């Protein structure tokens, strides 16, 4: 199945010149969603994975499904202030400012082997911050998987430079 055909492109969103890749159409299509999850799991099926971590918000949907397929637990990587208990946090730079992500202090056990899941990798800033946070919590991040890669923005290369293998299902040239 051609997964690109299940992803809606919205021109000039959220600002002029940006081509927004909307995976909500993919996850709303039962067949495309199933194919995407199966393909996200496949490269990691033989790896020993203890947990899947997914970044807010679409990474929750995808990561939960991947964790289910792998029969492992799920760790939500949330925006600051959204988790109700004690947290570890990681600040990271955005194009215009800074943001913070968090996980609960007990979400990861020392030595847990974790797969990071999100819908899209662009510059890699959020993925890098997530990996640093998971590593600080004691995890070994065994890989990162995405539906979409925007290779011109260099995110996958940035994550691979951290020693974390990356897989993605489709690539779009340009932004």
UniProtKB/Swiss-Prot annotation:
Pfam families: Pribosyltran. It is found in: Cytoplasm. It is an enzyme of class 2 (transferase). CDD domains: PRTases_typeI (cd06223). The keyword Transferase applies. The keyword Glycosyltransferase applies. Its main location: cytoplasm. Pathway: Purine metabolism; AMP biosynthesis via salvage pathway; AMP from adenine: step 1/1. Keywords: Cytoplasm, Glycosyltransferase, Purine salvage, Transferase. Its EC number is 2.4.2.7. GO terms for biological process: adenine salvage; AMP salvage; purine ribonucleoside salvage. GO terms for cellular component: cytoplasm. It catalyses: AMP + diphosphate = 5-phospho-alpha-D-ribose 1-diphosphate + adenine. Homodimer. Catalyzes a salvage reaction resulting in the formation of AMP, that is energically less costly than de novo synthesis. This is Adenine phosphoribosyltransferase.
């Amino acid at each position: 199945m051609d997964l690109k055909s299940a992803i809606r492109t919205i021109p000039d969103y959220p600002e002029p010149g940006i081509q927004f890749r909307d995976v909500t159409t993919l996850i709303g299509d039962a067949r495309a969603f199933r194919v995407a999850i199966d393909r996200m799991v496949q490269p990691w099926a033989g790896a020993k994975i203890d947990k899947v971590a997914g970044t807010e918000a679409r990474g929750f949907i995808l990561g939960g499904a991947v964790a289910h397929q792998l029969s492992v637990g799920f760790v939500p990587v949330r925006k600051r202030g959204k988790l109700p208990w004690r947290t570890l946090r990681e600040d990271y730079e955005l194009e215009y400012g800074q943001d913070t992500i968090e996980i609960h202090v007990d979400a990861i056990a020392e030595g847990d082997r974790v797969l990071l899941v999100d819908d899209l990798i662009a510059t890699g800033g959020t993925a890098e911050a997530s990996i640093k946070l998971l590593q600080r919590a004691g995890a070994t991040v065994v890989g990162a998987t995405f539906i979409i890669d925007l290779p011109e923005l260099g995110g996958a290369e940035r994550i691979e430079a951290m020693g974390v293998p990356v897989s993605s299902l489709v690539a779009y040239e340009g932004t």
